[in-house]
Amino acid sequence: MQAMQKYLLTLGLVASLVCLLGLAACNPKPEPNSMITKTMEKRSLARSKELVQGCQVCHGIKEAQRGPILDGMEYWYLYDQLQKFRSGIRGQNPENRSEHLMGIGVKKINNDLESAYLADWFARQTPKPAVRTVQGDLERGKLFYEARCASCHGEKAEGNRLLAGPALNRLEGWYFLEQMRKFRAGERGYHLLDETGRVMAAASKGISNDSLKDVVAYVVDAFGPEDEPSLRDRMVPAKSEKPF
């Protein structure tokens, strides 16, 4: 009798475990956005959606934006940069005008949850095509990238989260080149608490303008966003010889 009871008890435990595993498989953990939105009150959620619209004034493709396109960039990197702006680690140098404007803009963000919402929203968007404006020697850029960049940013510029190296394959060429120049000039990566920024600032010292253009042109050409036709290409017929 006791043996039968033990058998039934064991059978019941196994059945319960199978049931729990089945429920877990059918009910996976919610995606980050679901977790964020469930945490937010309706009023706060509506406000965060308004913040997205505010961000798109400078970071959208429909406006005369001069900020980088953020669509498809990694959540962890976007969140980290927003927090750096909010804490004053970035955006406090008036000589770096675009970054200084961002330092002013993030004052609209009230808390970490709103930062998380914004980072998550942009990370979920499909990367947008970009006009390729940076010209360089692709072969030299390839050699430079493999020797000095791939170890932290990945063989295909896909990023390396463990080394805090963001993906470079979603960056527009003009923005990529601008940021490298700012690292080199000490306009970015100067704050004592900006550990990853300081690494980049040190790594960019002594790099020539030609080498910067070469590596940016290579990364964008080999791994970057889909090529977007320029305004001239869109307005002038393909066979036209007339100047624009």
PLM regions: where:
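Extracellular/lumenal glycan-associated surfaces
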Residues: 73-74, 80-81, 171-172
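C-terminal motif of bacterial Sec signal peptides marking the signal peptidase cleavage site
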Residues: 22-25
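Bacterial signal peptide processing site
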Residues: 27-29
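Sequence/structural segment immediately N-terminal to covalent heme-attachment motifs in c-type
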Residues: 32-61, 134-158, 232-239, 244
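Bacterial N-terminal signal peptides that target proteins for export
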Residues: 2-15
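C-type cytochrome heme c attachment motif
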Residues: 50-60, 80-83, 104, 116-120, ...
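Axial heme c-ligation environment in periplasmic c-type cytochrome domains
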Residues: 64-71, 86-115, 125, 131-136, ...
